[in-house]
From Swiss-Prot:
Subcellular localization(s) per the UniProt record: Endosome, Multivesicular body membrane; Prevacuolar compartment membrane; Vacuole membrane
Cystine pairs: none
UniProt entry keywords in alphabetical sequence: Autophagy, Endosome, Membrane, Protein transport, Transport, Vacuole
Ranges for region Disordered: 1-93
Function noted in UniProt: In complex with CCZ1, is required for multiple vacuole delivery pathways including the cytoplasm to vacuole transport (Cvt), autophagy, pexophagy and endocytosis. The MON1-CCZ1 complex acts at the fusion of vesicles with the vacuole, through its regulation of the SNARE complex during the coordinated priming and docking stages of fusion, and particularly at the stage of tethering/docking.
Organism annotation: Gibberella zeae (strain ATCC MYA-4620 / CBS 123657 / FGSC 9075 / NRRL 31084 / PH-1)
Membrane protein topology class: Peripheral membrane protein
Family: Belongs to the MON1/SAND family.
Name used for this protein in its record: Vacuolar fusion protein MON1
Compositional bias per record (Polar residues), positions renumbered to this chain: 27-53
Amino acid sequence: MDSDSINPKPISSVDEDYRPPLPPRPSTNATDPGSLQGQATTAITPVEIQTLSFPDGSRGTFSTPGPDSIPSPAESGGASPNRHDSSTSAEVDETASLMSFAPTMRPAGDIASLLAGELHKKSPAWKMLRTQSASVLPFEKGRIGADDRFVEFYREFDPLPEEYDEDAEEDVLRLWKSKLKHYLILSSAGKPIWSRYGDLSLINSSMGVVQTIISFYEGAKNPLQGFSAGDTRFVILTKGPLYFVAISKLGESDSQIQAQLDALYMQILSTLTLPRLTHIFANRPSTDLRKPLEGTEGLLSSLADTFTKGSSSALLGSLECLRLRKSQRHAINNTFLKLRAEKLLYGLIVAGGKLVSVIRPRRHSLHPSDLQLIFNMLFESDGIKGGGGENWIPICLPAFNNKGYLYMYVSFFDGTSGEQASSPAAAQGRSSDEEIAMILVSPDRESFFELKQMRDNVAQQLAKNGTLAIIQNATRVGRPKIHEIAPGSQVSHFLYKSRANVQFCMASLEPHFTGLVSRRRLMTTYHELHASIHAKHSHLKVLHGVGDDATSLAWTTPVFEFYCVAGPNVSRATITQGANKIIQWAKREEERLFIIGGGVF
């Protein structure tokens, strides 16, 4: 054998083609499969996602180390975390990661990302997301079709079939039970008087059960005021020989529902007066009151429907006035006072259900509940409004005097000419919100012609000086819009009540709350705020509510009550800032928004 093959030559520095031999390849059986790494490597670290709300109202989403995440290099002694012991340095090189020793690592629980230096830098995509999330409107989730109680609310006022055979009775009864709100009136003897839905033959048995329950508690000297069955609330109001019952699935408080039942009682008294009602049942406790109340069913139904749809006036116990300049309202009052008839008790001008002007005796004022009855009669029911022209109506105003009648002259205006309307506004192609009426109240039943002459004189003067056109223009403008009174505010709607004047103003329902369902959602939120802040033993002055579909705020002081609603992503700081702007606006515009004093004689 050649000696050169036995004794290799030493490696010369000039021999550049020589390469050292590779180390032996690790055996594939060096690592038992059962001991293979089951955790993620440090390059793919298990993380948890956390969302934080910052003091400025913004929100951020961050990755935080999971429970099995890597420790810091100091804790691991410089070794690669989460790796198994290996007998070779090659395995160390394969399992270690440069990210294991990155200076951005934090102990578990510290809220940071691997890119800690970029934490406070907001990307364009993030800014766009923030802009879009702030523009989400209240109840937008509900409008998409959430499975809740209001999905079928648009069918709430569909009438039940009046004629049906015995086979269809179960279906009709099922329709009756599907309604979210019921009102029942019956006598203490169990005689049915009125029901909002269904004929009395359909619900006679239900009324009998209700009467039995109420009588049982009255016999125990513990009058029943309400009880619950699942998500349904039963509220009872006893007024002498009459029982008023409300069955509600709308989430209203007992005090709110009792106020509604009391309004129905006032509606009955406005027709019968208290002495006559008492006399009827004193002689015959089992009297059927349907005959004396014949013709007023429409008034009761329209009032009940107003409550079911959601009435801001009923909720706040106050009136809404038409927004006018102080000088313009002053001119209307002066015209009223100058042409006042001798037998006049109250004089009012009303436009679209809002009070424009009122003149009254110095020591008398009209209660909001009485005006609510008048407005319901004029603008909600089809009786007077459908007739147009002029009307002479005997009426009892229970809050003023529940023992006798007053006589009310009502005349609707035809445009700005001051002439009497020959037909309702709808027949003339005008909105009912543009209807203008004059109401003159007298205690003298023989004062019709005197009040008619006063109406003609006042209408002629208002048309002559252009005030009637100003009133009509104000009704067309409608309620104030948020972007006009608080530019940049993210508040979507508000209610503001002046406690001293017992009057309120509200934002326009357009464009987001004009629908029946969206308006009911809005009013339900207001009912919840009102119930919470006025709850018995509650000392809340400011209440901030956060839900999946809306953010809300209630604020009460001795001077005002304020309620507002915004989108679900609006922060507390943002909605409070918007509320402050609106309240400051209301204080500046107080003499335009509210009637302060009115005309007094």
